[in-house]
Design a protein with these regions (language model features):
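Catalytic Walker B motif of ABC-type/P-loop ATPase nucleotide-binding domains
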Residues: 165-168
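Conserved catalytic motifs of ABC-family nucleotide-binding domains
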Residues: 161
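ABC ATPase C-loop
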Residues: 157-158
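Conserved ABC ATPase "signature" region
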Residues: 117-135
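The feature captures the beta-strand-to-loop junction immediately N-terminal to the Walker
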Residues: 39-41
Length: 199
């Protein structure tokens, strides 16, 4: 099982007069259990790449293959792709919205149609995996520190049990201590789950 990018390019605004080349002729194979880092300066296309990996964007040119299937095909199941490739956006804490941490992490599994019991089990496992203190499970996510909010947001994606976890600049905006904590936590998640991690 793998994700293959075959000469993938992406252009923003192609039909709107303003053209911005975000990616050009990218070739990449992402295999099972890998830990991969995307490196580049601001505006180099890292966020565009993460959204292509999750199926939110379709390459302007070239192809992405997921489990041997071309994601551009009409009958390709994007819902399944998004369940198997979890995407943690840059500044994911801005997407928290529920009244408690636990409810926020349960949201994804609930929308997958899982039972309440299974949702709660997954939320507990994910929050524990990211090192979140159980005393804070029923606190409002808006009362947490920036680093804690980010852990909750990452746990929300992990609770859906994707096979690949793609994180768009997971340390953006954090202080040095927060960056080290988040990177250490991501490394631990990879070691415990053997999920493929792309960051």
């Amino acid at each position: 099982m793998s994700i293959i990018l075959d000469n993938v390019s992406y252009v923003y605004g192609q039909n709107e007069g303003y053209v911005k080349q975000a990616l050009k002729d990218i070739n990449l194979v992402i295999g099972k259990n890998e830990f991969i880092g995307l490196i580049g300066h601001t505006g180099s296309g890292k966020s565009t790449m993460t959204q292509i990996l999750n199926g939110l964007l379709v390459p302007t040119r070239g192809n992405m293959y997921f489990e041997g299937l071309d994601t551009k095909e009409k009958n390709f199941n994007k819902k399944e792709l998004r369940q198997k490739v979890g995407l943690v956006f840059q500044y994911p804490e801005h997407q928290l919205f529920e009244t408690t941490v636990f409810k926020d992490v349960c949201f994804g599994p609930k929308n997958m149609g899982l039972s309440q019991k299974e949702c709660e089990l997954r939320a507990f496992e994910a929050l524990t995996m990211v090192g979140f203190d159980s005393e804070l499970f029923y606190q409002s996510p808006f009362e947490l520190s920036g680093g804690q909010k980010r852990r909750v947001a990452i746990a929300g994606v992990m609770a859906m049990k994707p096979e690949y976890i793609v994180l768009d600049e997971p340390t953006a905006g954090l202080d040095p201590v927060g960056r080290d904590e988040i990177l250490g936590m991501i490394k631990e998640v990879h070691e415990k789950t053997q999920n493929t991690i792309v960051l």
